[in-house]
């Protein structure tokens, strides 16, 4: 491990936060000289996974606010698979502001804390946080931007894991650049999820001379993320993010770069409670191949949703800290392009990975 830690604060102690926190324990003593399943980088620059320390957390759920972060990871509606025991942290979950963070389905399911919201900026300063990770529910536009501004005001880097367009918004990007504060965003990809497999296969079609004519991706899951997304009013940015992540990777053809088109349908579809934190994705691509002959591909992907994202966030956090160490402000392009669905700059995945590896070693 390095001689310094990465002091991480979390906004939203749901399943994704749980998998990240447990994952740090699971990989705390991973050998950097070995290829370790589940990690792209045991050491990311000078930082080992075990260098991550959680120093603050914010939530609005009455069952999570005021209790130790370790206990909060297993409280209320959290339902992901357990991969490690988390010792008591000595960090109690703080009451964050609600703003638009609770949709109708959340309000019908959980009790909102009656505690007074804390001063988030001061809490981040007091915790000496290096990086703030936003894990708020989809549709939390106002709340996510509140935490983004809090990160700027507190002088800590920001990792935007949800589909609210901040790093990819020129005005917000300028705010972070002017403040000298790094941001990695927007909307975390999973390690092997529906988005990364769909975009890679769509590009493969085109690179092999097959035109992508139509495609769809239907996702179902049982966690609160999927229940929250039953509210279609909160879903617009998610559909845009997932769709452009796929179509931006198609270099040519009728669907290239399309966000809205009758021949593209990508997005969450339904909530199936007994799936818990599992997600099932059904993907179909229809194309035109040699001689105008149709060629179709259909597949189903089954994953535990939150550990699948934690394997990416664990690198995003370390990329943000490296940028902070180097005094780099604004969107961290190599990390955002490789790790996020809606970065400021969409790149082919192989190119984005090369740039990220170069960033790590300062090439």
Curated annotation (Swiss-Prot):
Among InterPro entries, the record links this protein to: MIPS, Myo-inos-1-P_Synthase, Myo-inos-1-P_Synthase_actino, Myo-inos-1-P_Synthase_GAPDH, NAD(P)-bd_dom_sf
Q: Which residues bind NAD(+)?
A: 68, 127, 147, 190, 225, 238
Keyword annotations: Isomerase, Lipid biosynthesis, Lipid metabolism, NAD, Phospholipid biosynthesis, Phospholipid metabolism
The organism's place on the tree of life at top rank: Bacteria
- Biological processes annotated in GO: inositol biosynthetic process; inositol phosphate biosynthetic process; mycothiol biosynthetic process; phospholipid biosynthetic process
Look at the named UniProt entry and state the broad enzyme category this protein falls under: isomerase
Pathway the protein takes part in: Polyol metabolism; myo-inositol biosynthesis; myo-inositol from D-glucose 6-phosphate: step 1/2
Q: Which cofactor does it need?
A: NAD(+)
E.C. numbers: 5.5.1.4
GO molecular function terms listed in the Swiss-Prot or TrEMBL record: inositol-3-phosphate synthase activity; NAD+ binding
Q: What happens when the gene is disrupted?
A: Abolishes synthesis of myo-inositol and mycothiol (MSH or AcCys-GlcN-Ins). Increases cellular protein carbonylation in response to reactive oxygen species (ROS). Sensitive to ROS-inducing agents, including cumene hydroperoxide, hydrogen peroxide, menadione, cadmium chloride, nickel sulfate, iodoacetamide, methylglyoxal, and 1-chloro-2,4-dinitrobenzene. Sensitive to the antibiotics ciprofloxacin, streptomycin, vancomycin, neomycin, and rifamycin SV. Leads to a mild growth defect in inositol-less media.
- Catalytic reaction annotation: D-glucose 6-phosphate = 1D-myo-inositol 3-phosphate
What family name appears in the similarity comment?
Answer: Belongs to the myo-inositol 1-phosphate synthase family.
The UniProt function text for this chain reads: Key enzyme in myo-inositol biosynthesis pathway that catalyzes the conversion of glucose 6-phosphate to 1D-myo-inositol 3-phosphate in a NAD-dependent manner. Plays a key role in oxidative stress resistance as its product is the precursor of the protective antioxidant mycothiol (MSH or AcCys-GlcN-Ins).
UniProt subunit comment: Monomer.
Question: What protein name applies here?
Answer: Inositol-3-phosphate synthase
The protein's organism comes out as: Corynebacterium glutamicum (strain ATCC 13032 / DSM 20300 / JCM 1318 / BCRC 11384 / CCUG 27702 / LMG 3730 / NBRC 12168 / NCIMB 10025 / NRRL B-2784 / 534)
Name the gene: ino-1
């Amino acid at each position: 491990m390095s001689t310094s830690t990465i002091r991480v604060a979390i906004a939203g102690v749901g399943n994704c936060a749980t998998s990240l926190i447990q994952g740090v324990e699971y990989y705390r003593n991973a050998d950097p000289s070995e290829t370790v399943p589940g990690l792209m980088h045991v050491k990311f620059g000078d930082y080992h996974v075990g260098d991550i320390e959680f120093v603050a957390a914010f939530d609005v759920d009455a069952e999570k606010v005021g209790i130790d972060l370790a206990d909060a990871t297993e409280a209320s509606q959290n339902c992901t698979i357990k991969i490690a025991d988390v010792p008591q942290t000595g960090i109690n979950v703080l009451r964050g502001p609600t703003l638009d963070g609770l949709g109708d389905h959340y309000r019908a399911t959980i009790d909102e804390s009656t505690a007074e919201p804390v001063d988030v900026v001061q809490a981040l300063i007091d915790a000496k946080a290096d990086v703030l990770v936003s894990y708020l529910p989809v549709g939390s536009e106002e709340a996510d931007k509140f935490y983004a501004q809090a990160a700027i005001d507190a002088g800590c880097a920001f990792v935007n894991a949800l589909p609210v367009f901040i790093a990819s918004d020129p005005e917000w990007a300028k705010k972070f650049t002017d403040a000298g504060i790094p941001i990695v965003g927007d909307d975390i990809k999973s390690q092997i999820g529906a988005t990364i497999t769909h975009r890679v296969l769509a590009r493969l079609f085109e690179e092999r001379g097959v035109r992508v004519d139509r495609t769809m991706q239907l996702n179902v899951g049982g966690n609160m993320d999927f229940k929250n997304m039953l509210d279609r009013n909160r879903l617009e940015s998610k559909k845009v993010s997932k769709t452009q992540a796929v179509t931006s990777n198609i270099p040519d053809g009728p669907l290239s770069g399309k966000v809205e088109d009758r021949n593209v349908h990508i997005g969450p579809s339904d909530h199936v409670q007994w799936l818990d934190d599992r997600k099932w994705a059904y993907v179909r691509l229809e194309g035109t191949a040699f001689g105008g002959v149709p060629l179709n591909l259909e597949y189903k992907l089954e994953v535990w949703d939150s550990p699948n994202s934690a394997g990416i966030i664990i690198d995003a956090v370390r990329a943000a800290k490296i940028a902070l160490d180097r005094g780099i402000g604004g969107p961290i392009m190599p990390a955002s392009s490789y790790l996020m669905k809606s970065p400021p700059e969409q790149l082919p995945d192989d190119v984005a990975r090369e740039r990220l590896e170069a960033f790590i070693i300062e090439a």
